[in-house]
């Protein structure tokens, strides 16, 4: 029978529940378990697709085109699995589904209520995740903080599941904070005690408490937490702040988190083989080189908006024994006169995806500077469109060339709306989303990176390169190294007379893994390392 683990959080948000859930998933997978994982978000939006990155951070896209929470990126990178649309559930999705059923008459005239209709729908989403993947274990992270009014239906639903399927098939892990009070020079357990009290008042007794802390906590403190929260002392797991996220699974394993889970759920687990993961952590701690990559974007104040890009750069760095430092550059502040100063000491420039006109001209200047000064350049999604516009303006001499998204009246719409998007009115869930094939042209940097003729990458865009300008661009040294199999959609562009200048319409950052870097990121960092060594 499938087992279900629920990860909740208390005291404050942003405790790292997602990292704990992902780490546990990795540990159980290495014990031979088939694992899937999902995130429940209590907000009323149907998905984060139309939310500002300042509100939510990155929107992570799955193979099947779901726009999801950034925690799914952590899940995929840690556990090395591909998730799907069942892996992210929001209040908006739940209420939408229930209301559709009510309109169809599925409830036979009954009064639709939070209990049982909303809670039943929530439980169904948990069970469905297991059925769709045939997983041994389903891990579900409950977003928000215990005590939030938005989370109450979610907590009630997972409370009911213990009675529905038996206590040995359900486990609750609660993440809390033990803050350090600098003036007193003490760690305090009281917030944890109150958070668990709140959770227990809702009918949920945690089996394990994971304590986030700035510094090691004493055994006496663990004993105190165990006493007041009515759990075994061994079930109080310390999660100290870490410089390297990938060391956390090893930290949790050392304290027996995965063994506690296996014992409680009566799982027949083999001994975990963490050799590859230990080698990764050792490598990360002993990188011998350092390079700097300038990231030119519009959301740089909130670095979570680019979290998969940053992690992908780091993964690629590991392959070259290089620590990748990010120089965050606000595209709105970039001008022709300061671009050299802003990117000083840079070994490579990356322009990631985005929407809207803010900062676009700064990104175009960055692409031009990288092209003219032979600095390795990588453009992603909007970054590819930016590179195309810059080349059209400054090499082909098409003054005023732009994207129809940014300037609908441009005389040269190098980037235009996808034909199937012309009659679309709703913004949410209507982009070109998910996994699509890309056919590569031989004797190009893209083909060299992938060493394959056809590759599959995840997309999230509404605009595309305008084929009316393809021949003109090709005749002037612009290389279309990747297209859709029918040749209609441009997927990858690059320059011949440049050490490494490549841009893609898709989002390669969504498929990178710490032990298996994404090919384009790997070659970009390889070129940047080479550039650094030649200085």
Curated annotation (Swiss-Prot):
It comes from the Bacteria. GO terms for cellular component: cytosol. PROSITE patterns: GATASE_TYPE_1. This is CTP synthase. Residues 1-267 are annotated as: Amidoligase domain. Catalyzes the ATP-dependent amination of UTP to CTP with either L-glutamine or ammonia as the source of nitrogen. Regulates intracellular CTP levels through interactions with the four ribonucleotide triphosphates. The keyword Acyltransferase does not apply. Residues 292-534 form the Glutamine amidotransferase type-1 domain. Signal peptide: none annotated. Mg(2+) binds at residues 71, 141. UTP binds at residues 13, 188-193, 224. GO terms for molecular function: ATP binding; CTP synthase activity; glutaminase activity; identical protein binding; metal ion binding. Allosterically activated by GTP, when glutamine is the substrate; GTP has no effect on the reaction when ammonia is the substrate. The allosteric effector GTP functions by stabilizing the protein conformation that binds the tetrahedral intermediate(s) formed during glutamine hydrolysis. Inhibited by the product CTP, via allosteric rather than competitive inhibition.
